[in-house]
A protein has these predicted regions:
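Phosphodiester-processing cores and adjacent nucleic acid-binding clamps
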Residues: 1-203
Length: 203
């Protein structure tokens, strides 16, 4: 509701490691859009009439475009934990978590693949947290948009420890897998690391 009031017409739900809130989020958005969808249906019916003048058609098309702009779009996603090794590795301290990676479904195929990845993270990769890995990311990447995520992301972590070669390799790997659907995040949130963003950008 707050997003809509501030002029935004879309929002993504990206809970960490799960999609438990997706159904409630989608259903609520569908309910909020119901009146607007009824208006769109009525406007399309009016446009289908054969006795309209060109001015009337233009006015109806304008109203239709404005109504379609009011539709709120729910973006279904997840902030996944990507294992530093294999999702099957469950022995070392570093296996207890994973790099953060934001995944968004851009179509039905992407939604199905996202559900598959999250499920595999719980069924096969769970070790303190549900983890996926590069192998299944590559296998189920179709229809997904990927973002490098927060300070816990793979690229940031490698930049932070000064391993720019490994960071570049990570960028190239994600670019190879997701193509134009891979994005690197830049954030302006306060951290306890002075000039962290500037140092990263300079390099």
């Amino acid at each position: 509701d707050k997003a809509a009031k501030t002029g935004m017409n879309a929002i993504a739900l990206t809970d960490h490691g799960n999609m438990f809130g997706v159904k409630e989020f989608f259903n609520y958005t569908k309910k909020k859009n119901s009146k607007t969808k009824d208006q769109i249906k009525a406007l399309k019916a009016e446009l289908g009439k054969t006795d309209l003048t060109e001015d009337q058609k233009a006015e109806l098309r304008q109203q239709l475009a404005e109504a379609e702009q009011r539709l709120f779009k729910p973006i279904l996603g997840c902030e996944a934990y990507v294992s530093r090794n294999s999702r099957h590795s469950k022995t070392n301290q570093e296996d207890r978590s994973g790099y953060h990676l934001v995944l968004l479904a851009k179509n039905k195929t992407g939604y199905r693949n996202l559900c598959k990845l999250v499920s595999l993270g719980w069924m096969e990769g769970f070790y303190y947290r549900p983890r996926i890995d590069h192998d299944i990311l590559k296998q189920y990447s179709e229809g997904l948009i990927a973002s490098s995520a927060c300070l816990g992301g793979e690229i940031h972590k490698k930049v932070e420890r000064g391993d720019l070669v490994a960071a570049e390799e990570a960028v190239l790997w994600y670019k190879e897998v997701f193509g134009d659907d891979f994005y690197i995040e830049l954030q302006r949130h306060k951290t306890d690391k002075p000039n962290a963003d500037y140092e990263c950008l300079d390099k």
